[in-house]
Amino acid sequence: MNTKILETLEFSKIKELFAPYLLTEQGQLELGLLLPTSKKETVVSAFLEMTDMQQIFVQHPHFSLAATQDITALTKRLELESDLNIEEFLALKRVLAVTQELKSFYEDLENVHLEKLDRLFDNLAVFPKLQGSLQAVNDGGFIESFASESLSRIRRKIQENENQVREILQEILKNKGEMLADQVVASRNGRNVLPVKNTYRNRISGVVHDISASGNTVYIEPRAVVNLNEEIASSRADERYEIQRILQELSDLFRPHAAEIANNAWIIGHLDLVRAKVRFMQETGAVVPDLSEEQDIQLLSVRHPLIENAVANDLHFGLDLTEIVITGPNTGGKTIMLKTLGLAQIMAQSGLPILADKGSRVGIFSQIFADIGDEQSIEQSLSTFSSHMTNIVSILEQVDSESLVLLDELGAGTDPQEGAALAIAILEDLRLRQIKTMATTHYPELKAYGIETDWVENASMEFDTDSLRPTYRFMQGVPGRSNAFEIAQRLGLSEVIVGHAQEQTDTDSDVNRIIERLEEQTLESRKRLDNIREVEQENLKFNRALKKLYNEFNREKETELNKARLEAQEIVDLALSESESILKNLHDKSSLKPHEIIEAKAQLKKLAPETVDLSKNKVLKQAKKNRAPKVGDDILVTSYGQRGTLVKQLKDGRWEAQVGLIKMTLEEQEFNLLKAEKEQQPKRKQVNVVKRANTAGPKARLDLRGKRYEEAMEELDAFIDQALLNNMAQVDIIHGIGTGVIREGVTKYLRRNKHVKSFGYAPQNAGGSGATIVIFK
């Protein structure tokens, strides 16, 4: 694609519209290099990627990426055997963390079929060992002491020496404070010094490092700490050497994987760009257009992307048309319509969504040429006409049948009669070569050309003669007219003068009357089309509302069914409990054999129905109505499915219940009574039966990887509550390493929870700092 069309249509400004939605430097770089292409398979691939990302957003509306830096230069440095510094390793650390998050997200992705993006997700390479090694590089920009034994030993020595220096200096401050200009320890040339009054400089022996501007204060390093400071300086040098050795070791570890990590970064940036395109679509109403097999263009409600509140227009440039000629006066929006077509094509061929409605269709052109605006060259001393004609000559030499040509004010800048003749000749040459062309002109002669010539259609921009303002609405099939007589009369010119002017142009008046009738017919057709679209929109709204009601009905139905199942299970549990009590009594008071007891128990279990319709059980309904809860009753909390005991009734009618390790305040409708009062139970014979052991324990692990922060905190809160209700002693929380946001949120939550006895990271072989083990009180 020639670069001149990109400058003419301000394609760089189009790309700037997508920049705010990008999160990664790699995505910004890819956007900056984005250019239109004539390769259909490339455009199709970009369109499918956007469709895939739209599906992801349906299931995960808040899908996002963490910010990453461009690592192209540093991966090349690795390949060239150079060593990386701490900041560069932090950039690698972030890329590996985002890679892990994306991989986990993709593995957990459900109900989404991806046609193109699946290949990108699959190609992400995860390096757990490399990520583990980078734990030694702290996000604050320093190497952790545990990176090596030598570094840990050196830093301990520095700490010890610094403590000794601090103690000695504090002692001097305490004992010789009157000799000091200030009761603080200062620093000069990297050494700890004391601000000594000049009159006492000989009373404190040591090394003078500085003197104040006034000369009243001398900064002295006491001799008692000189040797210690020398040791600290030496240890600092050892520390720097050891850090450099660690960085070299890490560089050697990463070097074999530089290409794969660079590819990860590219995939992250590309996914970021695709995500930005879809976010742009969500914010602006842009769409992914259909792609025509031939040069068949249909743009529905298309808008100019760089004009705020631009008027939407329909444009049909199908296979039955080679040229569209937009006629009419200036300032009506002809040039904007010309640019809108060009931008829609360039954006689509760059793999970007276009500002139009669904059902829009674009073609694929090998080149797009344009002569738009006044490109007069002062240096070449060319007139407006010469400038345009030079450009048009160049276009005619380069175009072929796969090109799209946009010509603004064709033939302008010279004698009107000659200019019109040239314009018709140029258009005819392009038509015979079957080159798609849209041209604007104010010459009336081209109206007749549009009417009389095959494969050519007239068009114009609507003008409101009442307000004397253009409406910027595109009227395809209707040639433009000047409206000069109507405008002059409305502005106050006498009817006599206007009438005399009309007599001078009888033929033109007839043509204008025909055009006026065509305009009226077009407006009527447009009104009908608008009405049809309004009905379609109402139908869509109705269908969406109906679908919403249907889904709500199904959810409520499922909720009621679940509630009924819980109540039914309560009855079943009660029956089984009573049956075990009966069998226990029988076992104590009879000589039944064990296998006979088991058979009897199995038969009793069969008495429990698979489902119980409580709504039709009048006896149970009456029994529940007659019996009120009281302190000491066993209950089932319906929202949690957990058993508890009523402790006391509050003044407002609510109940306080002990459920596991926590106390809860419940409304009466939030729990069900489990057992009848003992005095209401009939006396039964006792049989001893061995109870079944429940081997299915509650879930003791929570995986928060790939979750949003708010979603993760909600799941964590519910999980801890459930663990406490089940009297669990210990649970594991997997949060991953990533950006550290979720890990920090988990830590803050656990610190605030009064039921947590202790918590800490898992052993290295069980997840390390990517998992937290929680022990309850």
From Swiss-Prot:
Its EC number is 3.1.-.-, 3.6.4.-. The keyword Nucleotide-binding applies. One of its GO terms (molecular function) is ATP hydrolysis activity. ATP binds at G328, P329, N330, T331, G332, G333, K334, T335. The lineage of its organism: Bacteria, Bacillati, Bacillota, Bacilli, Lactobacillales. This is Endonuclease MutS2. It is an enzyme of class 3 (hydrolase). Endonuclease that is involved in the suppression of homologous recombination and thus may have a key role in the control of bacterial genetic diversity. Acts as a ribosome collision sensor, splitting the ribosome into its 2 subunits. Detects stalled/collided 70S ribosomes which it binds and splits by an ATP-hydrolysis driven conformational change. Acts upstream of the ribosome quality control system (RQC), a ribosome-associated complex that mediates the extraction of incompletely synthesized nascent chains from stalled ribosomes and their subsequent degradation. Probably generates substrates for RQC. InterPro entries: DNA_mismatch_repair_MutS_C, DNA_mismatch_repair_MutS_core, DNA_mismatch_repair_MutS_sf, MSSS, MutS, MutS2, P-loop_NTPase, Smr_dom. Homodimer. Binds to stalled ribosomes, contacting rRNA. It comes from Streptococcus sanguinis (strain SK36). Residues 702-777 form the Smr domain.
